Amino acid sequence: MPATSMEELVSLCKRRGFIFQGSEIYGGLQGFWDYGPLGVELKNNIKASWWRANVYERDDMEGLDAAIIMHRLVLRHSGHEATFSDPMVDNRKTKKRYRLDHLVKDQKPDVVAQVAEGIGESVENFAAVVAALVAHPAKAAEVLVAAGVRDPFSGEVGDWTEPRPFNMMFKTSIGPVADEDSFGYLRPETAQGIFTNFKNVVDSTSRRLPFGIAQIGKAFRNEITPRNFIFRVRELEQMEIEFFCTPGTDEAWHQHWLEARLAWWEAQGIPREKIQILDVPKEDLAHYSKRTYDLMYNYPTLGYEEIEGIANRTDFDLGSHTKAQAELGIQARVEENFDSVAKLTIPHPETNKPVVPFVIEPSAGVDRAMLAVLAEAYTKETLENGSERIVLKLKPHLAPIKVAVIPLARNREEITSVAKAIKAKLQSLGLGRVLYEDSGNIGKAYRRHDEVGTPYCVTVDFETVGKGEDPALTDTVTVRDRDTLGQERVRISELANWLQARLR
């Protein structure tokens, strides 16, 4: 069965070199994580699978890698300067700060109910409770104290301030002079780089509607309370598509991308029945969204949380960044833009008249994807002899190590030389990482590779080099299957094809 607690995953990730705390030798830095030898392989494999499915295997997609630091005008006209914020409260007693919705949600049910009652909303509609607290800050401070909202740090009822917005973008100075005219932002999402490069991509590729632009890259959000391992972090990586289509076809494309993304998650080992589709209520939609589907995965300990959002952003984004807005018939409500120097239109495929396209955006976080893949693959099994093993039943294309080549005797040159030659041959096939494993104890090596998700272990033994009891086994190796524990003798000359057929 999959992992049932976050602690199991955290322990495995630290022990086996998937994920480490950022800046750990100096006490760590909250909200920042480093990916170790196996973590970087798994992360890269997830990204490669996404890129292959959405760029290489489609005829309507282009790729992009935009800059991380953005001109502040980009994020002003996108709405981020004004709206990219979370409500924050302080406890005057402990001097700790918390994101309001997280603080209330984590209280005991009776306390949450008292907060809802105090602010005049139903406890069944938590979003409305938070919205009311934000809308009435003075009353909110009184309600939090009266309801007995406790500080997670001290465990005592806090002396809470009025909620106030906290903008989550990281500012940075650009150039040698640090003043108000020289600052920019670390991008809070990868999407804006796609929108600002829309005309460049269209002009350089001669694309016509419908088509998309895909990007994988880092984004930065100064979360008030980062938590839950790599689920909510301050430095994250996104896999985003902005799919441009003719107004009026957007709803059909929205459904298309919902199905396409569900199919991709299933191919990563997360069945459709493990994902809930949340049609986000109108009152909870982002300022740019006409309709959004949130794909919700049942994370251990956390419960159902968003793993991907698929939004119909209408013509808001290109309409916000284009010049000559008044003459383009933009349907979304956008702020006036007298700063842009580009007209972000494309010929309508039927009328050939300039049109500002609608946008469908599938947006997934690499870190959350990795956490879900690990949680779903994590399995505890009781073997016939009563012992327990932990195995990561990762899809082969995601496994950090594809094959481990193990010499049965690491001090016998005739065996190790064959094992090293096999490793070199398999590595040259382009399957992914192949590991030469000479730790000594074959049983422990098998268990270790079960735990990190290696699909196959290839053992070179005395029979392989013609020093066993059965001459027929010369030039063969034992291949062990991670999931079935089955073992099969395969001729060295056939090994590459045997593995390629199972790992592709």
From Swiss-Prot:
Example GO BP: glycyl-tRNA aminoacylation
Entry keyword set: Aminoacyl-tRNA synthetase, ATP-binding, Cytoplasm, Ligase, Nucleotide-binding, Protein biosynthesis
Identify the GO cellular component terms for this protein: cytoplasm
* Primary subcellular site in the record, as a coarse category: cytoplasm
In this entry, which stretches build a coiled coil? none
* Disulfide bridge positions per record: none
Keyword Glycoprotein on this protein? no
What protein family is recorded?
A: Belongs to the class-II aminoacyl-tRNA synthetase family.
Q: Quaternary arrangement and interactors, per the entry?
A: Homodimer.
Name assigned to this protein:
Glycine--tRNA ligase
- Origin organism of this chain? Deinococcus geothermalis (strain DSM 11300 / CIP 105573 / AG-3a)
Lineage at the top is:
Bacteria, Thermotogati, Deinococcota, Deinococci, Deinococcales
Q: Which gene encodes it?
A: glyQS
